[in-house]
A protein has these predicted regions:
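A domain-level signal for the structural core that forms small-molecule/cofactor-binding pockets
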Residues: 52-53, 94, 128, 137-138, ...
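A generic local secondary-structure boundary/capping motif
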Residues: 6, 55, 113-116, 144
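Long, charge-dense
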Residues: 79-118, 156-160
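N-terminal, charge-rich interaction modules
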Residues: 1-74, 80, 84, 149-152, ...
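Gly/Ser/Thr-rich loops at beta-strand to alpha-helix junctions
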Residues: 70-77, 129-136, 160
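Short glycine-rich or small-residue beta-strand-to-loop segments that form or flank ligand, phosphate
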Residues: 64-70, 95-97, 123-129
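Short, non-transmembrane amphipathic alpha-helical segments
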Residues: 82-87, 138-147
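Extended, charge-rich low-complexity interaction segments
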Residues: 116-140
Length: 167
């Protein structure tokens, strides 16, 4: 009998998928639409348009933007669209909602751009630990996309994983 230690994890055919690899680098910022409203609640069209066109949007160059309104103002749909039209010239991506909504959309976009044929009929483990904050919704979305193509799907680390699906 041999006393040689064999690293079965290293010799495994298991493919590790790390969602952190899909993290889009760049600043995430919130833009509160209420800053251009009268007393934070009333949209006066002429003043609003003037404020939007005179604002220096270059501060958001290369950023990922979560556009929202922190007050209970009743807004016409075009208000957020007018701001989006300005941001669209400088920002990488804009979403209506929170920073969590923004992060979700960034991961959905990245997952949708993946070529899943590489994972066809292979055992895949979705890495659970990462240094970046990965939204739970990204794990859910990735599972939906991978399950139809993989042979088996796990969560965690190769040395201690949770089985999720097996054909």
């Amino acid at each position: 009998m041999s006393n040689e230690i064999i690293n079965r994890v290293a010799n495994s055919v298991l493919i590790t998928f790390d969602l952190e690899d899909l993290y889009a680098p760049g600043d995430r910022v919130k833009v509160d639409l209420s800053q251009w409203l009268d007393q934070g609640f009333v949209l006066r069209e002429k003043e609003f348009r003037t404020a939007i066109t005179s604002f220096d949007w270059s501060v958001y160059k290369g950023c990922y933007v979560a556009l929202f309104c922190s007050t209970d103002a009743i807004l016409p749909a075009w208000a957020s669209l007018l701001i989006t039209a300005q941001l669209n010239q400088v920002a990488n991506q804009i979403v209506w909602g929170s920073l969590q909504d923004l992060e979700h959309q960034l991961f959905v976009k990245a997952i949708d751009e993946l070529d899943l044929s590489f994972f066809e009929s292979k055992p895949v483990i979705v890495k659970g630990c990462s240094e970046k904050q990965i939204p739970e919704s990204a794990f859910v979305y990735l599972t939906q996309k991978l399950q139809p193509v993989v042979k088996s799907l796990f969560y965690g680390e190769a040395c201690s994983s949770v089985p999720l699906f097996k054909k």
